[in-house]
Amino acid sequence: MTFYLRTRRKRLIGRILLVGFSSVFEKCFRMQLRDRKTWILVGTVLFFLLLFINGISKSGNRSDFRDYYNASVRFTQGNNLYNLDQIDEILAKLQSGEIKIEEAFSPKVFLQLKSMMEGLGSYIYPPTFAFLLIPISFFPYEVASAIFLTLNFLAFLGSLYIISLRFHRKGHLVFCVVLCILNLRFLENHQNNNQVGFILIFLILASVHMNKDWLSGFLLSLALVIKLTPGAFVLFFLMQKRYRAIFYTFVFTLFWIFLPCLYAPSFTIEMTLTWKQLILDNYLRSPLFRAWKNNQSLNATLAKYFLSYADILNQSRLGYPLLELSELVVKGMYSVFSLILAIPFFWKVFARRNAESALGCLFVFSIVFSGISWVHAFVFLLYPSAILLDRAWSFAECSILPFWKANTDSFSKKSLYSIKRIFRNDKVSFCFMAGSVLIFLCNRSIIGSVIEEKLMMASYLLYFAIFQYVLLLFALKYEPATRNKHEYDWN
């Protein structure tokens, strides 16, 4: 009996201690969670963790990285990196009448065209990029894909950090999360395709943010040998009169181009000349180059609108071309529209040496004037969005937040007043937020695949990029009514 009482007493004491410890732990936990900064930190970590998990869980799927991976493997084997001859073969069969456009949707012809186009120009980057990926090409595809996605994600976080520094929002986690949510469709699509865009954005931002000219040139040249579009940012160095940075960019570009010669000199030279001939001399000069439904660049949009052979699988099905013109006329239209877009940049931004606006415009140009701009390419809107969001955020801090703290009306009334106030005093911010929300809602899961197909064929994302470009120009001219005019100078 005594033993039983002792045992029961020990258990009771243990339970009391356990309950007491749990109570103290719960109180401490609640005190921490009541802290606003802790909530924000937990939410931010959870957001980026989910974003990373979403990407890494799909790393084993077929994606654009497979093209990089296969090209890297072919580099080690000495096999040709490029395979664009199908374009000439398809056009020859269409022009000779062997394949008739009106029979494009018959089962036999459709499957024939689909098989010919699936591997079409899968790798169009310079040989250096394939060479740089050789270390991870020795791993199985799934492992290599996960490594590349992780590097991409780290570059994405690095880009957000540089953005926070340039806009004096270091440690402002909510700003970064909102910026990501507004661009979530592009970020998610980029991860699903395991593309190289995040690395390019980081290299570009790091190059323009660094004060050392040799380091800026080194970083920008690396981005340039991966993809040509970062070459537009040489204009940023020119605007800032950083002529040494331009010189170092040129020198290091040559260094990166000839670096693979240490591994396979004759093969590197052969592939570099092949890339120049196939990509630069032939295909990128033609508006027909991969002008498919999902290609949202200016060049591809004009081809879809006015050239009958631009996207033979989708044009007739969706009511295109709108008007049949010759390729020469379409090229002329491209030149005219390019001038219309570029002149305001040089007149309003470049001449006035506004650093942030210039960067934002160049990121937009990297999408618009690229020969190929799939949905994932629009992650380049991250920086233009940051400029416009910073403006809207500052306006909200000055004019909206004090009202919310002082007013006791209902949530709906305060929200309606805030929208009216933004529209009345800062139309640039209002248009930016409205446009970003609209693009966010134009998702297949919301609007359906049929409507999304029609929007993609019309290149609605191209118009959204141009819309942001116009807002950047107006942001220079018009300041919010409640804020004094000032220059953004982060140098």
Language-model-detected regions and their locations in the chain:
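Aromatic-enriched
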Residues: 387-398, 407-409, 413, 419-491
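Membrane-embedded alpha-helical segments of multi-pass membrane proteins
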Residues: 150-155, 195-203, 223-229, 250, ...
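Membrane helix-loop boundary segments at the extracytoplasmic
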Residues: 189, 197, 369-381, 440-460
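Transmembrane alpha-helices and membrane-interface helical segments
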Residues: 158, 162, 202-213, 236-241, ...
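Membrane-interface alpha helices of multi-pass inner-membrane proteins
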Residues: 215-238, 361-369
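Primarily membrane-embedded glycan-assembly and transfer machineries that use lipid-linked glycans
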Residues: 24-216, 243-358, 362-375
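A cross-taxon signal for low-complexity, glycine/charged-rich
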Residues: 3-8, 14, 19, 23, ...
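Start-transfer (signal-anchor) and selected internal transmembrane alpha helices
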Residues: 1-7, 12-55, 168, 470-491
